[in-house]
């Protein structure tokens, strides 16, 4: 499963390639057709990551904006291409987004849905601080960890404690600091 840093990289890439301009959004597979229609032709205002969640914020003429919420899960991937040579969709492309110069295909996500800004807040409220965000509050994570008797390895994987950490970072962090993953928080 991609860890938080991968989603932050994707958010920066999508912001750079598609941000502040109208994009075409479709669903060759058909499972996201209704959601794609809600944002197709709209301006991608901002792409941001929070933990393992990716949010594409779109402007909307009626106001309020719409957001495509993506969680890649175990199998989700994005593949990029140039609009000079747009390939036919291969495999189960849930969402295809095409900008002026680049396009991207999303395959196999756990979640790909259109939500509103309030629902973004609901998703984020269930998560712990994301250490890669400037607005992260590390004291919040520290408080949850130190008050728990759960194993530190399990706490680091708990997205409500610390958002974005996966098995690779958990293992490396504990190994480098010589902390037993079964030690209580």
Q: Where do the protein language model's features map onto the residues?
A:
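Structured catalytic/nucleic-acid-binding cores of DNA maintenance enzymes
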Residues: 1-185
């Amino acid at each position: 499963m991609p860890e938080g840093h991968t989603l932050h990289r994707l958010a920066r890439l999508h912001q750079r390639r598609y941000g502040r301009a109208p994009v075409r959004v479709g669903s060759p597979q058909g499972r996201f057709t209704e959601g794609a229609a809600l944002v197709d032709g709209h301006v991608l205002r901002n792409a941001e990551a929070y933990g393992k969640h990716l949010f594409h914020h779109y402007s909307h003429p009626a106001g309020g904006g719409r957001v495509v919420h993506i969680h890649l899960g175990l199998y989700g991937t994005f593949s990029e291409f140039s609009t000079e040579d747009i390939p036919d969709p291969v495999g189960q492309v849930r969402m295809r987004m095409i900008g002026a110069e680049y396009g991207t295909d999303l395959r196999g996500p756990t979640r790909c849905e259109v939500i509103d800004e309030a629902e973004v807040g609901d998703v984020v409220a269930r998560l712990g601080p994301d250490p890669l965000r400037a607005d992260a509050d590390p004291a919040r994570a520290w408080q949850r960890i130190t008050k728990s008797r759960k194993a530190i390895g399990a706490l680091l994987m708990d997205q409500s404690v610390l958002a974005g950490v996966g098995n690779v970072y958990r293992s490396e962090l504990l190994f480098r600091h010589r902390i037993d993953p079964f030690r209580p928080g």
